[in-house]
């Protein structure tokens, strides 16, 4: 097979404050993969951006590992492949870079192993590997999605929510924050009353989004009790960013995924001034407007 598989895979932001490990939204930052068979004796990698060049090129490469895991599950063998990679999704910043790579790996195994997975099956596989659907679901489908993974039945259920009519700003620090380190900051248990309170806030926030009530949704996004109180100290710029966003009447300022990126839901009439104010004042980060991605992963076959 000499055909080239081209994948364009969006970034994602998870949690939206109170939707811990459940809610996620796709963003217009992308991992681009171009994959074809090689006559070499092992998988080959060509990186076109500086961040990707730090990734391993042996069997510890994440895309290789996941693709082989999927192939083994369906009892198929994959040929040796050459993967060209270009990404504008920063690594370990809370923008779903690992979820994008995971989805890409499943698509690679599916095509070159001729597995014939449906998109629903891709979601089930990705969530089983990742452990929760908050990043992988919007990466696959696009848009804003709430989901639940039942780790007993291994089933994932998702519900699509209307795309918010807001401008999205991401404030990206220069430093990494590994998900594992961010998760270590979380408590092992919550009291029943704490869980009930956070669940009620999350439920109401989703309803507010569904009703396009961004004032209420934003207010509730900032009342999380599941993870943000335990992670904010890991992000030195969080309080300053939130203060500046509030001064510009933003709907909400929350941690994107495990951090350190900070996500802002901004009023459209204020977003330009806000992002410029952030770049003037928070010099250890880069702030930018980013569109919500509505299409999810895109696959194209180039026949040769």
Curated annotation (Swiss-Prot):
Disulfide bonds: none annotated. The keyword Cell wall biogenesis/degradation does not apply. Its main location: cytoplasm. InterPro entries: GHMP_kinase_C_dom, GHMP_kinase_C_sf, GHMP_kinase_N_dom, GHMP_knse_ATP-bd_CS, Homoserine_kinase, Ribosomal_Su5_D2-typ_SF, Ribsml_uS5_D2-typ_fold_subgr. Its EC number is 2.7.1.39. One of its GO terms (cellular component) is cytoplasm. Keywords: Amino-acid biosynthesis, ATP-binding, Cytoplasm, Kinase, Nucleotide-binding, Threonine biosynthesis, Transferase. PROSITE patterns: GHMP_KINASES_ATP. One of its GO terms (molecular function) is ATP binding. Pathway: Amino-acid biosynthesis; L-threonine biosynthesis; L-threonine from L-aspartate: step 4/5. The keyword Lyase does not apply. GO terms for biological process: threonine biosynthetic process. ATP binds at residues 90-100. It catalyses: L-homoserine + ATP = O-phospho-L-homoserine + ADP + H(+). It is found in: Cytoplasm. Catalyzes the ATP-dependent phosphorylation of L-homoserine to L-homoserine phosphate. Belongs to the GHMP kinase family. Homoserine kinase subfamily. This is Homoserine kinase. It comes from Staphylococcus aureus (strain MRSA252).
């Amino acid at each position: 097979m000499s055909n080239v598989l081209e994948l364009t895979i969006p970034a994602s932001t998870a949690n939206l404050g109170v939707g811990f490990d459940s809610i996620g939204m796709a963003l217009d930052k992308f991992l681009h993969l171009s994959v074809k068979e090689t006559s070499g004796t092992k998988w080959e990698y060509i990186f076109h951006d500086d961040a990707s060049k730090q990734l391993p090129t042996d069997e510890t490469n994440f895309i290789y590992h996941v693709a082989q895991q999927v192939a083994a599950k369906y009892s198929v063998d994959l040929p040796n492949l050459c993967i060209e990679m270009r990404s504008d999704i920063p690594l370990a910043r809370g923008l779903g870079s690992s979820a994008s790579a995971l989805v890409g790996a499943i698509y690679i195994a599916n095509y070159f192993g001729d597995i014939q997975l449906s998109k629903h099956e891709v979601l089930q596989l990705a969530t089983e590997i990742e452990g929760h659907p908050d990043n992988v679901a919007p990466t696959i489908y696009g848009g804003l999605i709430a989901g639940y993974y039942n780790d007993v039945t291994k089933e994932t259920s998702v519900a699509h929510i209307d795309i918010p009519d807001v401008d999205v700003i991401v404030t990206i620090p220069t430093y990494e924050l590994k998900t594992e380190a961010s998760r270590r900051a979380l408590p092992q248990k919550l009291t029943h009353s704490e869980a009930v309170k956070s669940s009620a806030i999350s439920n109401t926030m989703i309803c507010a989004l569904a009703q396009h009530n961004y004032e209420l949704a934003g207010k509730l996004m900032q009342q999380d009790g599941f993870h943000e109180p335990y992670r904010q100290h890991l992000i030195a710029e969080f309080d300053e960013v939130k203060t500046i966003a509030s001064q510009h009447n933003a709907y909400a300022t929350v941690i994107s995924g495990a951090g350190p990126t900070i996500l802002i839901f901004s009023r459209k009439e204020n977003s330009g001034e806000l992002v410029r104010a952030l770049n003037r004042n928070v010099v250890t980060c880069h702030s930018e407007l980013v569109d919500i991605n509505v299409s999810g992963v895109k696959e194209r076959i180039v026949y040769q």
